[in-house]
Amino acid sequence: MLRRLTRPQLLFAAALGVAGGMYIYQPIFEQYSRDQKELKEKVKILQESEEKRS
C-alpha cells in the first residue's frame, strides 16, 4: 500500500513547495522592506535636523 515517490517527483514537490511559500509570503517581505526603507529615511532626516541645531 505504501507507494514511494521517485527522486524527480520529490524534487518537483519540494521546488513547488518553496515557490508556493515565496508566492504567499512575498507581500509580507515587500511590506517589511518598505517599512525599513521609510525608517532609514526618517532616521536620516532626524540626524540631519539634529546636526543643524548643534
Curated annotation (Swiss-Prot):
The keyword Transmembrane helix applies. Plays a role in regulation of the unfolded protein response triggered by endoplasmic reticulum (ER) stress resulting from the presence of unfolded proteins in the ER lumen. Residues 30-54 are cytoplasmic. Detected in a number of tested tissues including pancreas, brain, heart, kidney, liver, thymus and white adipose tissue (at protein level). GO terms for cellular component: mitochondrial outer membrane. The keyword Membrane applies. It comes from Rattus norvegicus (Rat). The chain crosses the membrane at residues 10-29. It is found in: Mitochondrion outer membrane. Keywords: Membrane, Mitochondrion, Mitochondrion outer membrane, Transmembrane, Transmembrane helix, Unfolded protein response. It is a single-pass membrane protein. This is Protein PIGBOS1. Homooligomer. Interacts (via C-terminus) with endoplasmic reticulum (ER) protein CLCC1; the interaction occurs at the mitochondria-associated ER membrane, a zone of contact between the ER and mitochondrial membranes, but does not appear to play a role in ER-mitochondria tethering and is not affected by ER stress. Residues 30-36 are annotated as: Required for interaction with CLCC1. GO terms for biological process: regulation of endoplasmic reticulum unfolded protein response; response to unfolded protein. Residues 1-9 are mitochondrial intermembrane.
